[in-house]
Structures are given as C-alpha cells and as structure tokens.
Amino acid sequence: MAQGFAVGFDPLGLGDLSSGSLSSLSSRGHLGSDSGSTATRYLLRKQQRLLNGPPRGIRASSPMGRVILINSPIEANSDESDIIHSVRVEKSPAGRLGFSVRGGSEHGLGIFVSKVEEGSSAERAGLCVGDKITEVNGLSLESTTMGSAVKVLTSSSRLHMMVRRMGRVPGIKFSKEKTTWVDVVNRRLVVEKCGSTPSDTSSEDGVRRIVHLYTTSDDFCLGFNIRGGKEFGLGIYVSKVDHGGLAEENGIKVGDQVLAANGVRFDDISHSQAVEVLKGQTHIMLTIKETGRYPAYKEMVSEYCWLDRLSNGVLQQLSPASESSSSVSSCASSAPYSSGSLPSDRMDICLGQEEPGSRGPGWGRADTAMQTEPDAGGRVETWCSVRPTVILRDTAIRSDGPHPGRRLDSALSESPKTALLLALSRPRPPITRSQSYLTLWEEKQQRKKEKSGSPGEKGALQRSKTLMNLFFKGGRQGRLARDGRREAWTLDSGSLAKTYPRLDIEKAGGVGPVQKFVTWRLRRDQERGRALLSARSGSPSSQLPNVDEQVQAWESRRPLIQDLAQRLLTDDEVLAVTRHCSRYVHEGGIEDLVRPLLAILDRPEKLLLLQDIRSVVAPTDLGRFDSMVMLVELEAFEALKSRAVRPPALRPARQDTPPKRHLITPVPDSRGGFYLLPVNGFPEEEDNGELRERLGALKVSPSASAPRHPHKGIPPLQDVPVDAFTPLRIACTPPPQLPPVAPRPLRPNWLLTEPLSREHPPQSQIRGRAQSRSRSRSRSRSRSSRGQGKSPGRRSPSPVPTPAPSMTNGRYHKPRKARPPLPRPLDGEAAKVGAKQGPSESGTEGTAKEAAMKNPSGELKTVTLSKMKQSLGISISGGIESKVQPMVKIEKIFPGGAAFLSGALQAGFELVAVDGENLEQVTHQRAVDTIRRAYRNKAREPMELVVRVPGPSPRPSPSDSSALTDGGLPADHLPAHQPLDAAPVPAHWLPEPPTNPQTPPTDARLLQPTPSPAPSPALQTPDSKPAPSPRIP
C-alpha cells in the first residue's frame, strides 16, 4: 500500500513514523522465525531480496508499489524538467508561506505547487503554480508521501527549495481499486471484487467486544501489529499478535478490526494517527470486531487528466487517452468528496490534512521501462514504469526498547502455511524487454534459420544495434586460433575466407587495440599467402569464384549493409555505396569499387562500413582490397579510439520518475563518436519545447467542471495549504476536523501557470521599484534584472520573467569577508567597454564594492566561430550549482582550436548563449552538453556565441584584502570546472604554482595576466594545479 499498515515491520521505509522509531522498530519482522520452517524463512528472504535488490543509496521504494503510467505527464523526461530552479522562501511575519502543494508518492506523483497566494512570500520568491519540488533544505522529496512532504515544508521558517518548472499540476479523473486479503480462518488469499470492500460488505457481521489493556510507562507493550488507515480506504486491522503478549492474553486475534480506542473512532483515521492513539496511553479501551481477515496489498488503477489548451472556458486534454496508473499497493481512500455543480467527468479531488511521515533510508527502487511505437497522429508520448510490489507494512504497538521478559514471537509463526501464502502472494515482477536486445526465443529462431538457410545466408552478418556491439564487440561467429586470438569466418564461394574481426578492447589486456590490429593483419597476410600457394597447385576451377553464389551472398548481405549505411551516411551516399557494390558483384573490378568508396567514406565513423563491404569482396580480390584500405582504416580506428567519450545522451536515471522509453539508435557525431539517440532525433524535443511555450501562455479558468458522483475508490488529491498544517496530537479526543470552507467555484484539476505580463509593469518601473526596495532595506542584491530578457532560442516553460536571483535562482551566501577582485584577462580595450549595471540584489549585508565584485557586469558581445576545426578548444567553469560562480565562464582557450583562431574570445568571458540557447542559470553539465551539441551541429554554420565582456572592477581596500587572508573559501564552494576537450593538456600550458603562501584558495581558474603593473593574485592553491581536462569537440 501507499504507506504500510503496521508499526514494527517497515521493510521499505514507507511509514509515517519518525526516523528514530523506524530504526528501532525495523528489527522486528512481520513473520516469526522461531517456529517457522527453514524453507519458509529462506523463501521469505529470497522474495525480499528479489523485491528490494541491493541498496543503492538513500532512496525509498515508491509506496505505490507497481505503477504503470500511460500518457504520462510532461515531467517524465522533458527538457524543461532538467532546468532546476533554486527558490528561497521565508515565512511572513504572520507565519505564512503562501502556497499549497498536491500529489505525493501514494498517488505515484511528485510534490507539485498547486496554488500560490497573491502577494505572499512564495510569490515574491518566484514560486509558480506547476513547480515540482524536488528538494527542501537539503532533503529530497523524491518518492515522498504528502504527509512527509508537508512535515518537511512546515518544519522550518526558511525554506531553500530546488524546483523543476513543469507548468502543470496533476488531478485524478478516474480510479478503481482491488484489495487482496489474507483469510486467517481458511488460510488463503482472497481478492475482493471491483468496487466492493470486505470491510464494507461485512460491516455488520462479526462479534464486537470491548477489551481493556493496562500497561505501565516503564514497560509499554501491547503485543500486536496493526495495518490500514483512511489513506488506503481501509480500517485498522490486527495483522500480528505477539505470542504470550498482552494482546493475546486479552483475546485479541489476528484478523480483528479495531473500531475505536479510548473513544476515538478508527473508521476514518489515518495510520499514523491510530499509532499515536494506541501508543500514547497506559490504559487503552479497544472496541474489537472479529473479521478473520486483514489486507495484504492493494491494486489501484487511476487516470489523470492533463490540460492542453483553453477554449471557451473548457479545459481540454492532451489526447482522449488520459494517464492511467496501476499500482499494487494501498493508496485508496474512502474519504468523502465534494461534488461539483457543473456536469462533467472531471473533478478537483480535495485531500484532507495528511499526516506527517518519514521514510527509512538505504532501500533501492527497481525501475524498468519500455517504449512502444509513438502514435503518428498524436503528440502524447507513452511510457511504462514498473516498480516493485509493496506488501503493506505493520506497526508494532510496543515500546522502542527491548523487553527480554516477554516473547515477541508472532502468532503466525505457528502457521508456516500462512507465511508461505504471504510470500507467494507478491505479484511477480513483469517481464520487460528493451527493444535494443533480442529475446532468447528470437535468438533460437535466428539460429534455426541460419542452420536451415543457404550457404549464402550462413555467411550473413549478425549485428546488434547497440553502440558497443556495433563498434567493439564481435558480431560474427568466431573461433579461437591456436595462439588464443579470435578470428571471424564467413562462408563464401564454398571456401572459408577470413574477414575483418571485431576488436574487443576489454579482452585486449596489456596489448593495445592498435597493436593487436596490426599483429592480426600481418599474421592474416602470411596465412593468405600460404593459402594462395596451395590454391595454385589445385584445380584452376577452385580459384574462380562462382558469380551466382557471389550475387546470392550480396543479396543476403545487402539489407545489413544498407541498414548500417543509413545510420552513417546520407541518403545519396547510401544509394551511391549500394550502386558501386552491386556493380562490383556483377562486373568485377576491385579498384573501381575502392576508389569511389574512399571518396564517399571521408570520415572515420563512415569507414566502419568497410568492415561489412569486405564480406562482399571475392576471395581473390581481398588482398588488393586490404592493401588499398588498410592504412585508412588504421587511421580511422585510432581517431575513433582517441575520441571515445561517454555519451551525454545516456543520462543516469532520476529518482523522481522512471525513465521514458525510447527507440534508440547509434548516431555518429562530427568527431567520430557515437551517441544513442531516439529514432525521431531532436525534432521531437523541439516540438515539445514549442508546445510548452504555448502552454505557458494559458491561464486557469475560474470555472471548472467536476463529476457529480465521483468513483468511491478515488484516492484524494487535494491542494494542501502548508500554512494551515499543524502536527496532530491525539489524546482521548477524536481527531480535529478541518474548518468549513466557504463555497466557491471549483477549479480545474489541471492548473497552469498564468501569464503575468499584464500584471507586470514595464522594466523601467520594475528596476525603479527594486532600487527603492533595496534602499529601504539597506542591503544590496547579487544579480541585475537582466535575467528578465531571454535569448531567442531559450526554451522556457512559461513567459513569466525570471525573478530576482537572490530569492529564486540564486543562493543566499553566508556573510563572508570581502575577496579581492579577480584579474581581468583584457587588454587596453577592456577599459572602454561600458558596463550595464542593474539593481544589485544580495541577501547579505555588504557594501557597493562587494556587490560590484559579486555582480558580473559588462557588455554583451556576439562572437561567430567556424565549425570547420576539429575542436572548439575551450574549457569552462561555473554553473548554477556553484555558490561562488553561478555563471558559466570561459576558463581556458587552447591553441589550435576554433576559439583560439577567432581571436575574439578570452579567458574570463561569461557565456550567455550559444546558437540561440541560453546558458544562464543552468548547471555545469548542462552547459557542457549544450556547447558540445551546438558545435557538433554542422548544419548551423557559423557558431554564434553571446558572451559578456567583464568590465573594470574596483580595487579592494587594504582592510578587505587583509580580511580575506583570515577567512579562506571552503573547498566545497569551488565552482564546477570541466574543460570541454578530449585531448590532454600539455604541461607547458599549466600555470606556475603561486609563490605567495597567504593567497586563499579560489575557484582555480586559469586567466591571462593583465597589463596592470600590480601582480595578479594566483587563482589556485599553492600545493595543487588545476587538473587538465578534455576540450570541446
């Protein structure tokens, strides 16, 4: 279920207990092990290992269990979701934050901002409707329940949040559920019918009685576990009874339902509230009903609606097929819902106050995904996420410390059959397959075809469509020679002829791939010479190839060659290569084949096609063919080997959402490397970016439509105001209810960010207000208002101007002593550059001099670079994750690159945009990927770089300089620095170590000295040098 049903066994850390309670209670298992059989315990442990897998850091499994999302929200895998904004919100003097949240992992969703009050601190900080909160004060909200998220958001008066700007908020349209129960009497599992719950159908059945339990504060242990809660649409059930405990002595049995405790009704109470009631009293009066069953897990299927556009006040979805999620968990609810006044099939489900909770650390999440063929007529992408099944956890009603005087064995331990049923009741993980691989059945079918095929078909190449198998792995069947080297053979013209083997770098060992390749060539030539001598002594007819067999072999290999050629070449080049190969097969002439091929295959990655064309060459022409292409292949292979880098397209899976399925294909870049990209390429992302820009201009309709009779099993999904939340403390009174809300028009379940252009004054008025505000508060801010302007190519989820960086995208810096300004790598022309100053904004008490040093001012300049050079030849540093240098700057320019030859770029320039794509307020890795992708795109020539030339900065005062000596910059505040080239930096390019031992460590940038007579301070630590890094392609 969404959160477990009991308080002692929390295998996945999904409960609402504090971390201390979970750590102390997690050692008590759900099923006893003293009297259970060894086979049963082994099976349980094996099932648990298969379910959880090895721990992979502090990530909790989703309480949704197995989730299948169809037509998922745009947060799944979009460019906009990669843009992380830093927002800092402080409570107002009245103690309000001014925003509401929606979602939660119990619904298979993240935490979304659904409402932002006008004039609140959240609105001033730049928080927008549709933002997905991923982190708060260093705590991740990925796979977090709503109760836990609200507890984190209300635990501090100052929130530093990392959000992803999605521009939309989820809402549930339809839901149905199915619960699996453990029948204690008949020792079997019972699956309820859709729409009926055993607790509802048997509400009047069973014997009810009142049980009094007396404990002491020193030895508090009730001796039973509970499951259920209103967040799951279930009551509170007893799932385990300790052998010889207090509950067993008073007649409480497994399968009993707790109807009330100390006057608090349990028919509409959350799991954590029930735990508080049961654990907080020394005298507990329980109302018990015998049901003979308790819930094991629950399946839920939900459908979510997503707004596309607004026409005539009616909300429209992206497509008729809405998002649906199916989860093996317990996240249903039987809470009452308000019905709308407008006839429609949608409703904004309201969620009551969720209880706070926390998750146990150290449990991994198993996510698999597959992509179906996208619909040509729609814009909705389909993805599937499968998460491990979660059996509802138990909460043990006992004290945290051990009690050696009592046995806490389970009553179920006396019945291994029940334990075995529970272990086998977990739904098997679905069988998934990636479309880049072949199943075992397909491999067997291919082997049968190879055995039963013609000799020409037996020689056909078997190729995997992944990058590593395409380039390094051996795709042909090989055998081990006497010296242990692998050789590939193909059957052609009735005789065995050696073909070009796949190079396996992993098995090369101490011998380099180039040396192995050359050795193989020499040994093969020697063996070919001996084979020719022996063939001359034989019959003349054996030397002549059969034309029919050669044509048949060409026809069998033609689809494979064309498939690879289409990935490496243009359409015209593919036709030319096919035409030349066909002419050679029918007419002969190896020179007429090689010369045009070498002209067409003019790049290292294109020369990979020669490996497959070699299989078409007749055995008598192989020697001539190899002598003509051997040197070119060696050079190409060495170039590819030196440029092998990790493809940036293979991003690590994020924790919030499972990966979206793509049909991938290896695509070569201009440097000879390969990247695994979607079959549709980048146009799909561009279309999505245009769609998001259009959606950003939409506004929310005040009139929404909602169904009159919503489905009973729909889990609530309401806007939870974080300001109205107060931790619930239950004694002997019923849980407090929410205050009544005045009737108002229901808002739609999908909320978009409203455009603020009509509400915003002109830029000059904004600047004047910001200056007056900064004077009234007697503090300066760190960024100018230039962030309101965007480059033409920047993709933004909404047209809202970028708020002040100090409150939204910036970070508050702790008050530090002043640092001397960095030396400017400019010549005499730098003094002539006019600095464009905006209203300075900073969260610290500083002087104008400090603001000038922190505020990078300068003139915007457009620089064009040619992409004809092999490498761009620059390295960059900084990024939004850096507290010292949030902007991206050029760190070093390497000789021989395109940047060096242009002469217009210098170290220290700030990169603002590249080929129309904005580089402001982006992470370091995103800036690296953007620059690399722009330089690889040879279709856009030349490359346009918008840089900010730094202006002259005031010299620091002696007091400031001396103050800097006392307080150094911590090492963890160094900006992310990653040069963007693949070639190592020679030693003579590195700076000399500084001689002044009192120079503080800074961001380790390499700048050219200025012509000023004063010596420039060294920008690195005395005992370290900046590590050389590869250049940009």
Curated annotation (Swiss-Prot):
SMART domains: PDZ (SM00228). GO terms for molecular function: identical protein binding. Pfam families: PDZ. GO terms for biological process: auditory receptor cell development; auditory receptor cell stereocilium organization; detection of mechanical stimulus involved in sensory perception of sound; establishment of localization in cell; establishment of protein localization; inner ear receptor cell differentiation; sensory perception of sound. Residues 770-784 have a biased composition (Basic residues). One of its GO terms (cellular component) is stereocilium. Weakly expressed in the inner ear. Expressed in the retinal pigment epithelium. Disulfide bonds: none annotated. It is found in: Cell projection, Cilium; Nucleus; Cell projection, Stereocilium. It comes from the Eukaryota. In cochlear developing hair cells, essential in organizing the USH2 complex at stereocilia ankle links. Blocks inhibition of adenylate cyclase activity mediated by ADGRV1. Homodimerizes (via PDZ2 domain). Component of USH2 complex, composed of ADGRV1, PDZD7, USH2A and WHRN. Interacts (via PDZ domains) with WHRN; the interaction is direct. Interacts with USH1G. Interacts with ADGRV1 (via the cytoplasmic region). Interacts with USH2A (via the cytoplasmic region). Interacts with MYO7A (via MyTH4-FERM domains). This is PDZ domain-containing protein 7. It comes from Homo sapiens (Human). The gene is PDZD7.
